[in-house]
């Protein structure tokens, strides 16, 4: 693993360093004031500003602004990235042919460039998936409530599959819906539909929503409708994985 950094290179020195990194399969990161033009399925232009540029050996190219986790412009892998000079500026050109696309970044001032000869053969393995939550609950129903007994996993109804159909210590039916992410109002609505279906033949049926967490708005909606929430915080998601929910869901 090798890391080389050059501060404030001239356009010509930057082009030499960048193309050497591309030839040798290194990751290149650049801090620069630049403007970006995209042409392909649509077209777009991003005016002058300070940005972080990342070029990877597989042709992936990313343009990051100072805030936010998503790149403002990018090129997926499968293409090429090259450096050149044009009208006194250094230029990074990322392009691919299927579909035909190009991202041209004109660097008006390069603050720094880092070459990273990275080695990484690991594969990301996610733990705590929804399937693992189901396995855990099925093996440990007491984690939700003492005396709870699972009768059926993924029972089919006309509204869809209920995650768990159970009975509590008193023999009362319990409909359980499990979510991997923070519980939302959509999840509450789903559980309520299931419970209403069973309440047609048994007024005593209980409804239980299980998730790593829930907002006060969701727990209030559950409480106001006679439903319950159980938190399994150990299955909470971090920034590596979750499905995004709309603000109105909470």
Curated annotation (Swiss-Prot):
<dbReference type="InterPro" id="IPR049173">
    <property type="entry name" value="NucS_N_sf"/>
</dbReference>
<keyword id="KW-0238">DNA-binding</keyword>
<dbReference type="GO" id="GO:0000014">
    <property type="term" value="F:single-stranded DNA endodeoxyribonuclease activity"/>
</dbReference>
<comment type="similarity">
    <text>Belongs to the NucS endonuclease family.</text>
</comment>
<protein>
    <recommendedName>
        <fullName>Endonuclease NucS 2</fullName>
        <ecNumber>3.1.-.-</ecNumber>
    </recommendedName>
</protein>
<keyword id="KW-0540">Nuclease</keyword>
<keyword id="KW-0255">Endonuclease</keyword>
<keyword id="KW-0963">Cytoplasm</keyword>
<keyword id="KW-0378">Hydrolase</keyword>
<dbReference type="GO" id="GO:0005737">
    <property type="term" value="C:cytoplasm"/>
</dbReference>
<dbReference type="GO" id="GO:0003677">
    <property type="term" value="F:DNA binding"/>
</dbReference>
<dbReference type="InterPro" id="IPR002793">
    <property type="entry name" value="Endonuclease_NucS"/>
</dbReference>
<dbReference type="InterPro" id="IPR048302">
    <property type="entry name" value="NucS_N"/>
</dbReference>
<dbReference type="InterPro" id="IPR048301">
    <property type="entry name" value="NucS_C"/>
</dbReference>
<dbReference type="InterPro" id="IPR011856">
    <property type="entry name" value="tRNA_endonuc-like_dom_sf"/>
</dbReference>
<dbReference type="Pfam" id="PF01939">
    <property type="entry name" value="NucS_C"/>
</dbReference>
<comment type="function">
    <text>Cleaves both 3' and 5' ssDNA extremities of branched DNA structures.</text>
</comment>
<dbReference type="Pfam" id="PF21003">
    <property type="entry name" value="NucS_N"/>
</dbReference>
């Amino acid at each position: 693993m090798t890391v080389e950094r050059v501060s404030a290179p001239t356009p010509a020195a930057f082009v030499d360093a960048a193309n050497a990194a591309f030839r040798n399969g290194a990751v290149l990161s650049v801090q620069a004031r630049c403007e970006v033009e995209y042409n392909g399925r649509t077209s777009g232009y991003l005016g002058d500003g300070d940005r972080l540029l990342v070029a990877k050996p597989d042709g992936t190219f990313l343009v990051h602004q100072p805030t936010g986790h998503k790149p403002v412009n990018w090129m997926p892998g499968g293409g090429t990235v090259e450096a050149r000079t044009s009208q006194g500026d250094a230029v990074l050109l990322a392009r691919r042919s299927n579909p035909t696309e190009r991202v041209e970044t004109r660097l008006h001032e390069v603050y720094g460039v880092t070459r990273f000869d990275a080695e990484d053969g690991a594969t990301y393995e996610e733990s705590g998936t929804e399937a693992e939550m189901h396995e855990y609950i099925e093996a440990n129903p007491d984690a939700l409530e003492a005396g709870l007994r699972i009768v059926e996993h993924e029972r089919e109804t006309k509204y869809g599959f209920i995650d768990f159909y159970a009975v509590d210590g008193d023999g009362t039916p319990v409909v359980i819906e499990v979510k991997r992410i923070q519980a939302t109002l959509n999840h509450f609505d789903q559980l309520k539909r299931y419970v209403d279906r069973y309440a047609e033949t048994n007024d005593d049926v209980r409804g239980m929503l299980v998730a790593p967490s829930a907002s006060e708005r969701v727990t209030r909606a559950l409480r106001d409708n006679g439903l319950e929430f159980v938190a399994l915080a150990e299955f909470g998601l971090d920034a590596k994985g979750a499905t995004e929910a709309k603000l109105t869901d909470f």
